[in-house]
Amino acid sequence: MARFGQPQARCRRCAVPSPAGVAECGRCLGAAPPVDACHAAVSYEYPWTALIAQYKFNGQAGWARNFATLMRSAPWVEPALEQADLVLPMPLSRQRLAERGFNQALLLARALAPQKTDAGLLLRVRHTTAQTALDRKERLGNVKGAFALDPLRAALVRGKRIVLVDDVMTSGASMFGAAQAVRQAGAAVITAIVLARTDEQ
């Protein structure tokens, strides 16, 4: 599967496609996101849109390992995983987990770094409307206050290098909301790793 993922120049902070040689996009230069780096394996376009939909919504949980191999093929992902102290999957609300039957981000995280993945440290404390039908401003408001760390174990991230894992990143609202919660708990370095990134922020 990795051979079908073509390398793409991307903003180092949000992974949106950018011209070769441009380290950061204009949006990130104007307002730096709460992640230090963001890496994406592929653009969220056909055939990846269809494959990811099958993975998430049609019970193809077994595809996680192949997708993780694809993610590892992206530049800088291997070093980020090697240097990480903890790998945290983006959490689902209880309602979404019940609908889907599994957390696709958790399966990816475990396939990427089984010894470093902590499934219960980052929590989604509020169920949110599905982001797909919302514009950027609405998405940012939708996830505000939706993420928190387990208060009994939040100190585990203090001064540590944290990797956040998700399958798809669109506006970045969910990823950055989660990263903000991790940053507020004292994480030293936060890197986001996603399977697919949309071409627009």
Give a label for each model feature.
Residues 1-201:
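Glycine-rich phosphate/pyrophosphate-handling loop used in enzymes and phosphotransfer proteins
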